[in-house]
Structure formats: C-alpha cells, structure tokens
Amino acid sequence: MKPYQRQFIEFALGKQVLKFGEFTLKSGRKSPYFFNAGLFNTGRDLALLGRFYAEALVDSGLEFDLLFGPAYKGIPIATTTAVALAEHHDLDLPYCFNRKEAKDHGEGGNLVGSALQGRVMLVDDVITAGTAIRESMEIIQANGATLAGVLISLDRQERGRSEISAIQEVERDYNCKVISIITLKDLIAYLEEKPEMAEHLAAVKAYREEFGV
C-alpha cells in the first residue's frame, strides 16, 4: 500500500465516509463496512479528494486527454481532479460532464465544459452495478470519443449477481482498465496494521471469503 492510499483511508475514516459495523447494502447483503462518498462535502474535503484522485491517476500511468464526470456525483470529482492535476502535477487537462436533462436554450445539448473528444478518463465515486458507466459510454461513443479508463475511489472487489464483480464486467464489456484509489485488499492491509481494529478485520475477511472475487 502506498502512502497516499493509507492517507486516503484515514481521511475517509475521519470524515465517517468509511465506517465499520453492520450495514445492509442495496443488494440485501449484510456488509461489515460502508463507504458513503457523499460525506466528502466541504471545500477542504473536495480539495483533498481531488489530490487523491490525481495521485491515483498519475500512479496508474494510463494516458488520457480529458476527464469526464457523469452526473451527478461525478461532476465535483472531475472538477476537483482537474484542479489537482494542474496544481500538483503540472497537467492542465480539459474536463466535461453531462446534464441529466438536455438544455433546449442557450448553447443547448447535454454536455457542459470542454468538447468531449479523444481519450476519455471517466471519474466517479464507486461502481455498484455499472449503470452510470453504461450510460456514460453511450454519451462518449455518440461524440466519437474513446474510453481510456475509469477511476473510482473504492473497489469493493466483490461479486455482483454473477461470478465476477461489476468492475470486472465493465472492464470486459468496454475493454478498459478500471482503477481505484483503494481496494478491499488495501483496506484489509490497513486493518492488519491496527491491533485495536482486530474485530473489524475478522468481519471484513469473512465477508471477502464469502463474496470476494
């Protein structure tokens, strides 16, 4: 685990974005941890979040021309990541996002920001069922652009309804790489460093044993 990944886990814990306990997911599964990126909700949070996304992007080595944030949660992520890339990595890249409702006045259309073209890096909070990615792919393809990759904050590394995860389905269906700031594996490595969190470690490992990929 790299220093920025450990720092991200501590940031998420401090903001109660990442919590341990017993939580019922939308799928009905009982999970020993929960991640709610919506709680990154202040200016400072967004500034830090952008730095972690930018760090993961640079670390990945993936090449891309533009950041795309799917409405709604992806919009502030794309914006703050673009700022962090410019400020901390000297990479001044364009970004854009979509509207859920097409505008019928002014410049019209359903895209805001730079023209959607070239190799697109899609940024979002998490991938649950992959629905937002599929909707975004339609927009990207309709504009003649290509998907360079997807970056999310956390990869839960667990099976969906089939034997593979929603992330693996996206990688298979769109022939692209999905990267994340942290994975479940990183979370377990972090818990292993904290003797006071042994109870949570056992629960998370048991969950991975049952649902992991």
UniProtKB/Swiss-Prot annotation:
<comment type="subunit">
    <text>Homodimer.</text>
</comment>
<dbReference type="GO" id="GO:0004588">
    <property type="term" value="F:orotate phosphoribosyltransferase activity"/>
</dbReference>
<feature type="binding site">
    <location>
        <begin position="34"/>
        <end position="35"/>
    </location>
    <ligand>
        <name>orotate</name>
    </ligand>
</feature>
<dbReference type="GO" id="GO:0000287">
    <property type="term" value="F:magnesium ion binding"/>
</dbReference>
<feature type="binding site">
    <location>
        <position position="128"/>
    </location>
    <ligand>
        <name>orotate</name>
    </ligand>
</feature>
<keyword id="KW-0808">Transferase</keyword>
<dbReference type="InterPro" id="IPR004467">
    <property type="entry name" value="Or_phspho_trans_dom"/>
</dbReference>
<keyword id="KW-0460">Magnesium</keyword>
<comment type="similarity">
    <text>Belongs to the purine/pyrimidine phosphoribosyltransferase family. PyrE subfamily.</text>
</comment>
<comment type="pathway">
    <text>Pyrimidine metabolism; UMP biosynthesis via de novo pathway; UMP from orotate: step 1/2.</text>
</comment>
<protein>
    <recommendedName>
        <fullName>Orotate phosphoribosyltransferase</fullName>
        <ecNumber>2.4.2.10</ecNumber>
    </recommendedName>
</protein>
<dbReference type="InterPro" id="IPR029057">
    <property type="entry name" value="PRTase-like"/>
</dbReference>
<dbReference type="GO" id="GO:0005737">
    <property type="term" value="C:cytoplasm"/>
</dbReference>
<feature type="binding site" description="in other chain">
    <location>
        <begin position="124"/>
        <end position="132"/>
    </location>
    <ligand>
        <name>5-phospho-alpha-D-ribose 1-diphosphate</name>
    </ligand>
</feature>
<dbReference type="InterPro" id="IPR000836">
    <property type="entry name" value="PRibTrfase_dom"/>
</dbReference>
<dbReference type="GO" id="GO:0044205">
    <property type="term" value="P:'de novo' UMP biosynthetic process"/>
</dbReference>
<keyword id="KW-0328">Glycosyltransferase</keyword>
<dbReference type="Pfam" id="PF00156">
    <property type="entry name" value="Pribosyltran"/>
</dbReference>
<feature type="binding site">
    <location>
        <position position="99"/>
    </location>
    <ligand>
        <name>5-phospho-alpha-D-ribose 1-diphosphate</name>
    </ligand>
</feature>
<feature type="binding site" description="in other chain">
    <location>
        <position position="26"/>
    </location>
    <ligand>
        <name>5-phospho-alpha-D-ribose 1-diphosphate</name>
    </ligand>
</feature>
<feature type="binding site">
    <location>
        <position position="103"/>
    </location>
    <ligand>
        <name>5-phospho-alpha-D-ribose 1-diphosphate</name>
    </ligand>
</feature>
<dbReference type="GO" id="GO:0006207">
    <property type="term" value="P:'de novo' pyrimidine nucleobase biosynthetic process"/>
</dbReference>
<keyword id="KW-0665">Pyrimidine biosynthesis</keyword>
<dbReference type="InterPro" id="IPR023031">
    <property type="entry name" value="OPRT"/>
</dbReference>
<feature type="binding site" description="in other chain">
    <location>
        <position position="100"/>
    </location>
    <ligand>
        <name>5-phospho-alpha-D-ribose 1-diphosphate</name>
    </ligand>
</feature>
<dbReference type="GO" id="GO:0046132">
    <property type="term" value="P:pyrimidine ribonucleoside biosynthetic process"/>
</dbReference>
<feature type="binding site">
    <location>
        <position position="156"/>
    </location>
    <ligand>
        <name>orotate</name>
    </ligand>
</feature>
<comment type="function">
    <text>Catalyzes the transfer of a ribosyl phosphate group from 5-phosphoribose 1-diphosphate to orotate, leading to the formation of orotidine monophosphate (OMP).</text>
</comment>
<feature type="binding site">
    <location>
        <position position="105"/>
    </location>
    <ligand>
        <name>5-phospho-alpha-D-ribose 1-diphosphate</name>
    </ligand>
</feature>
<feature type="binding site" description="in other chain">
    <location>
        <begin position="72"/>
        <end position="73"/>
    </location>
    <ligand>
        <name>5-phospho-alpha-D-ribose 1-diphosphate</name>
    </ligand>
</feature>
